């Protein structure tokens, strides 16, 4: 079953969660580390569970796991065995599912909303490199090598019971093609693919967003496609480009409006003056069916989206 379409058959919008790392930092975590939020899986997993709970309370219909930078290679570099790495990758799913089940067990949390789903985050190859190439896509490896890189983590996340895979911040069509080829090894699994973008027309490596949508549109296991980890001013035109070239649901979860410098690993500038919720309403009107937040967004931003999303007419 396609879990995204299952919800969209009844509800006009799926509200995603927001940033994990931002919330962990607000709770006192130091994420200046190549493992990023995966470091907290090792050290303080209960904090990750609390962030998931906060987003469900804010109105999120989907939790994205803390596995974006969780790779067998990354954990091995810290001296963890393959079995230990697998346990942590699976833990990212079980923590989110536990938070969801506890939240959903209370009747007052079930009003006018679908049961939330768990999306297992699969970051790009560049996230493992931690050198900023996730925003460029200029990898020096082949499509076949990308498949070999993604296979162990994808298999572990599926076996852990994730409802859907969130293949996110993908900077190049080559990596998306590798993921689609790999998905065929798991024919009952659905995924979304969301790209990082450099402007209102192109993903990070310069490929037209329209071409990405056209290519992905033909593949059954892709449950949704779209854009994340991108300045929010580019989102309206990117939705238009995608919508013209696919019949699949469009997903968007951009950054707050600040600019990330991958060289210094710092954020600069201010968040968008317009409320995040108001911007999100514009994205929905343009055709997005799954909306949330990426870097620097907070539960308050998700609450802004849920406030108007719950008033939309269900079918």
Swiss-Prot record:
Knockout mutant characteristics: Cells lacking this gene show reduced bacilysin biosynthetic activity.
Co-factor requirement: Zn(2+)
PANTHER family according to UniProt: HOMOCYSTEINE S-METHYLTRANSFERASE-LIKE ISOFORM 1, ZGC:172121
Reactions catalysed, as given in the entry: S-methyl-L-methionine + L-homocysteine = 2 L-methionine + H(+)
Gene Ontology biological-process entries: methionine biosynthetic process; methylation; S-methylmethionine cycle
UniProtKB keywords: Amino-acid biosynthesis, Metal-binding, Methionine biosynthesis, Methyltransferase, S-adenosyl-L-methionine, Transferase, Zinc
Hcy-binding domain residues: 2-309
InterPro entries referenced in this protein's UniProt entry, alphabetically: Betaine-hCys_S-MeTrfase_BHMT, HCY_dom, HCY_dom_sf, Hcy_S-methyltransferase
Protein's organism: Bacillus subtilis (strain 168)
Protein name: Homocysteine S-methyltransferase YbgG
Signal peptide: none
Taxonomic classification: Bacteria, Bacillati, Bacillota, Bacilli, Bacillales
Enzyme type, top EC level: transferase
EC number(s) on file: 2.1.1.10
GO MF, any single term: zinc ion binding
